[in-house]
Regions:
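Surface-exposed interaction/gating patches
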Residues: 45, 141-221
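Short, glycine- and small/hydrophobic-rich beta-strand elements in well-ordered beta-sheets
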Residues: 19-33, 64-90, 96, 184-213, ...
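Acidic/histidine-rich, surface-exposed loop or edge segments in extracytoplasmic proteins
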Residues: 36-47
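Short alpha-helical elements within RNA-binding folds
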Residues: 59-60, 183
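Hydrophobic, ordered structural segments
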Residues: 45-55, 61-69, 74-155, 171, ...
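Short, low-complexity, Pro/Ser/Thr/Gly-rich segments in the mature regions of secreted, periplasmic
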Residues: 255, 259-265
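N-terminal export signals
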Residues: 5-25
Length: 266
């Protein structure tokens, strides 16, 4: 073999090996990193408490079954433990990717079973609307908890409560730092003390950006308070809250204490 041909063949072989190694590394990386879900969080701002039964009927008989037929589940539906007047109903919908989120609107609207089951709600007259407005946030799950996790009492449909929190930040960079703080140990600490988080989401669209939203759970109020007390004493939390890189990441905290609707899948 001529030296020129030998070098040519050697370079080609090296390139193939490099490509193979890169592909293998990429494959391993994709196997190690679970795909992060996307979430839509809706807040139905009802006209009055009198319209809540119609919304419940629509969600339980029409909307949730339609989502489930598209493989979108579990869908959570919650009311406030101490509802305001008029009340707000929260709906949490998980999506595999943004395309599923965008397509769901059209697929659901063309679903004959959905249209039939939701006819009363969908045909509500202008003179008697069910809600004032629907607020909606589209969120990306955190890398530290890429999918919804259901505790045993949710799966078994036992009595349970949820606390949902939104952490607003004064800048985009500080909002990302707070997400990193969760991913770098805060989520683990919450699991370890029994706070039983359901989801963590970085808001991509919606009101009051930038912010993140997450939900914890417990079997009752006493257990929930006990878990938060334990979290406050956790060494990992003590380390994180005193780390200068995470200073001033949160400018406003909003909390909701929620109870699941009887038909909620969370």
């Amino acid at each position: 073999m001529k030296r020129r041909d030998f070098l040519k063949n050697s370079l080609a072989a090296s390139a193939l090996v490099s490509l193979s190694c890169a592909a293998t590394a990429q494959e391993h990386a994709s196997q190690k990193a679970p795909v992060q879900e996307y979430y839509e969080l809706r807040a139905y701002r009802l006209k009055s408490a009198a319209t809540e039964p119609m919304l419940d009927e629509f969600l339980s008989k029409a909307a949730l079954p339609a989502f489930n037929r598209l493989g979108i589940k579990p869908v959570g539906v919650f009311g406030e433990i101490q509802p305001k007047d008029p009340p707000t109903v929260f709906v949490l919908i998980p999506y595999a990717n943004p395309a599923q989120y965008a397509g769901a609107v059209h697929h659901v609207a063309a679903d004959p079973d959905y249209l039939k089951a939701g006819a009363a709600y969908l045909g509500t007259p202008k003179s008697n609307p069910v809600y004032d407005r629907i607020d909606s946030w589209f969120m990306l799950a955190f890398a530290g908890m890429p999918k919804i996790v259901l505790p045993a009492y949710s799966k078994e449909r036992k009595p349970r409560l949820f606390e949902m929190r939104t952490y607003e930040s004064y800048s985009e960079s500080k909002a990302l730092k707070k997400v990193a703080m969760f991913n770098n140990g805060e989520i683990d600490a919450m699991h370890e003390v029994g706070l039983a988080p359901i989801f963590y989401g970085q808001a991509l669209t919606g009101p009051n950006l930038p912010h993140l939203t997450y939900m914890t759970s417990a079997e009752n109020e006493e257990a929930h308070k006990k878990h938060w007390d334990a979290f406050g004493k956790h060494p990992k939390w003590d380390q994180l809250k005193n780390d200068p890189q995470y200073a001033d990441t949160v400018s406003k905290i909003t909390k909701w204490f929620l109870t699941p609707k009887p038909y909620s899948q969370i």
